[in-house]
Amino acid sequence: MLIPVTEDPSRCAEYMELVDGLLIPGGEDIAPEYYGEDPVPQVNYINREKDRYDFELIRLAREQKKPIFGICRGFQVLNVAFGGSLYQDIPSQVPGAICHSQSLDLRNVPTHKVTMDETSALGRILGKEIYTNSYHHQGIKKLGEGLQIVGSTNDGIPEALESEDGLVFAVQWHPEELYNDYPVFKGLFTRLIDLASQK
């Protein structure tokens, strides 16, 4: 089910009673104030209402021990929710970074390599190396507490994470744009379903 954005925390609690897990999708930049920084000029559109809503859903899911799968913005918002921070603009803040923002006309085309920790849950699904699409200009700077980086690009930018308890996992790319052509990515969604079915 799609959960509508709301500023009413009690509604978030009602929504969470109806689901066994969360998928947090892509979207706008996260307001830098949530990780203690002022915005740089390259920050794009932000939506504080959506930020607060996502943080509340994450808080409730963690409290209720329900699984969470984050995609792109979802990857970043999970890191911030766990106390981490972000590079607000990789091209201007990370010297030597590769291109992480490909043409939007090629959403189903893998453009860079991600090296995975084969011992991690996501590594067991995706293998040691995987090529992914990429549509982001922000990325993890300081890792949130209780999270582990399990996949990165050659420039060191994190691309996949898991929580220590295994209930949270996220990727910086967009597997929903890839799985028709590259079925291995369906395994990420299967993992969420499998974890949710145990609740």
Identify what each model region corresponds to.
Residues 12, 32-35, 79-81, 180:
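Short glycine-/acidic-enriched loop or helix-start segments at secondary-structure transitions
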Residues 32-49, 181:
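Glycine/threonine-rich flexible loop motifs
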Residues 46-53, 70, 78, 82, ...:
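Short, well-structured alpha-helical patches and their helix-loop capping segments
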